[in-house]
Amino acid sequence: MKGTRAILAAALLTGLPLAAHSQGTRAPADAFLYIIWPPDGATVKGAFWCRFGLRGMGVTQAGSNAPNAGHHHLLIDVDEPLDPNEPIPQDKTHLHFGAGQTEAHIDLPPGKHTLQLVLGDAKHFPFNPPLVSKKITIMVK
């Protein structure tokens, strides 16, 4: 008990954020996340392949604590910023690729759509600061 109190006191005195300890994995400063295809402004017919790019880090499966690695999440028509203290949502607009996929076959209804990648850590939290691609806009015919 004394040891636990000493560790807690030391953490509080040094300003270590205990609640966020397992969150906010740092990415290398030169890491760069991007959408290879489709290009910004593209018009696609029906379902299409979306290809993901990452430089300066590796792609791994969800749950892996491999250093300098994460897995892709594709945000579709999402305008709200992600909360870095919460896991990336998983729903029809926040697609998870936890098996380490670097491409996906996407089927969207006709119209204008935005796509953006976010790299998640082992527990689906965004990196700190968040590693996100440029948001692109496509037209689906």
What annotation goes with each model-predicted range?
Residues M1-L8:
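Bacterial N-terminal signal peptides that target proteins for export
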Residues Q23-K45:
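Short, compositionally biased P/S/T/A/G/V-rich stretches that sit at domain boundaries
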Residues G46, G70, P109-G111:
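A glycine-anchored, Pro-Gly-centered beta-turn/N-cap motif
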Residues G53-S64:
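Short amphipathic, basic-aromatic surface patches that mediate peripheral association
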Residues S64-H72, V132:
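Short coil-to-beta strand junction motifs in C2/discoidin
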Residues P81-D83, G120-N128:
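Short acidic/polar inter-strand loop motif in beta-rich domains
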Residues P129-K141:
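Short beta-strand elements
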